[in-house]
Amino acid sequence: MRVIGLAVVFILRLAFASAAETQQPAKIPRLGYLVVAPLSETPSPERAAFLAGLRELGWIEGKTITIEYRSAKWNIEDLAEELVRMEVDIIVAAGSGAPLSAARRATSKIPIVMTLASDPVGAGLVKSLTRPGGNVTGGSSMTPELGSKRLELLKEVVPRVAHLAVLWTPAATFELRATRAAAHKLGLTLKLMEVRNADDLARAFAVLEKQRPDALTMLFDALTTGYRGLVADFAKKHKLPTVFGAREFAEAGGLMSYAPDIAEGFRRAAIYADKILKGAKPADLPVEQPTKFELVINLKTAKALGLTIPQTLLLRADHVIE
């Protein structure tokens, strides 16, 4: 009987141990969120869209997922390396340019989800849009038609445009190619001015004051977005119509913007994160190109420039700033 009793105790202990193991909480994944722009307690529209996308898929911050936010204007490389040392399960590069480049240099193993890459193939981030082939996937902000569409909109508002100044950074090479092709088709002459920092921008302004183009555009990336207020103010002061590749430029005082819905891009990034956290490999997840676009027109700026926006264009606008 003693032997039977010991056997029963042993079996019960095994059962309790097994039950305890099954009751152990599952490992909560950690997501690194890398961004240039300063973070505030109130999420930006883009971050809010990303978090909403996660919630729709069952990922609740602080409960089913931990998010490590890292934001810096100058030491983004160090912060990307810090996320790698923390062994996060995935990194979301919020925005194009610096966050994505820093994350890619920091790791070739941890999955990286991009949100606004303008030319992921040309930048060497992925092998192709259909088969990325590495640890990076996500959304691209560009389609070949965008460059021509923006210039067509500009011509619709200002038919006399013949000379267009283009401020661009190396991160916007794909968009620059598309803009060049569109300008050639429309018979526009381009004045290309590379901007890598505030000093370059000041020099560009000095040149534009002397050369006086008919209109101005600044190609979109994380760096140029930070200068949107300066560019919009300069353009208004010198009566230059503008068209941009992000609604933030129009909201800052630019004449108009035509761009992918950025918040939608961040919501889609949450879908990529969900798939990867559930076992999918970035190498096998095709890169998405935008399908939803927004036309934003700033009527206050139009009035300041003495321009009349055609009613047909106003009716097509997704958002009009009055």
PLM segments and residue spans:
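Short hydrophobic alpha-helices and adjacent helix-cap/hinge residues
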Residues: 1-322
